[in-house]
């Protein structure tokens, strides 16, 4: 960890207490909540904005970029609107992702059996094309992938960020 201190003893300390032949495992109750963070600066094309994560909890797990798209006619809008995303801790760059890498990662790692891709027509958004193609719930979440050149109003989309601590709760980043 770059940021290390007395507050993360529950995460980094020895989680076992041994008395003779019995092992008692220590655990801490927790809950998960989505907390919206705001950007510093104005969001526009080719602009750089930053968001400071507030200390409203103990850990950071999943992160999403929320965007109101309006009417678009560009495939994979969410990933294509991102040039790069940088994670800095204490002014030191820890991780950096590019929009085209995020698109490739989503295509390679999201299988149908995971339940991420919607299977019913009720959970799909039509692209407006006559060829019967649909933008699935995952494609909507991962930035409207597969949308044809026809203009579509997807409303709010959520682009999942793929930092190491977003992959499972055991890797969550302590605040």
Model-inferred region functions:
Residues 1-175:
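Short, low-complexity Pro/Thr/Gly
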